[in-house]
Amino acid sequence: KKNEPDKFAKIAKIMLPKDYLAYRLSGSFCTDVSDASGMLLLDVKNRCWSKEMMEICDVKEEQLPKLYESWEVVGTLKPEVAEELGFSADVKVVAGAGDNAAAAVGTGTVGDGQCNISLGTSGTIFISSKNFGVDENNALHSFCHADGSYHLMGCMLSAASCNKWWAEEILQTKDFAAEQAPIQKLGENNV
């Protein structure tokens, strides 16, 4: 708005990448609350767009997608899409979820207090909660979870590269795989 006011004035709709795919597949202008939680425009606790944040950001509600829970059906394939893909037009399109919320569901991190830590390009700690909560130290973000509950999440960049640093600088080895072998054994047989 400040740097490119002409472009800001032309914004008709605001979508996240997965939501654009849902739009192209079904024609539904929508998002899910887990992904919308990271847009700074969502009242996470109440799972609705925040009037206060829309006013601060000068965004109108009609520019924002309709909100769904992650598992909710948002539509079916448009006939021309179904024909092009060779699918039935009855194929349902669901709202989906943000990447970390979807990963948490996939790893079973859905119970109250369960924690998931992932290391990759970023490092993420994800704590599921049946109730909305706010970290008073502002170290963790409050989000809607894909299973209808909430979660606290913290992220940092370059997380997996920390493993390399740890192995080389602290453990004085370049064989990170050998260093991790005893840890891997702890996870065998569902232990």
Q: What do the PLM-derived regions correspond to, one by one?
A:
Residues D32-A36:
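Nucleotide/phosphate-binding loop and acidic/charged catalytic motifs
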Residues S37-L41, E62-E72, L152:
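A glycine-/small-polar-enriched, mobile loop at the entrance of the PLP active site in fold-type I
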Residues K1-F29, L40-K51, E55-I56, P79-V191:
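Active-site core segments that coordinate phosphate-bearing ligands/cofactors
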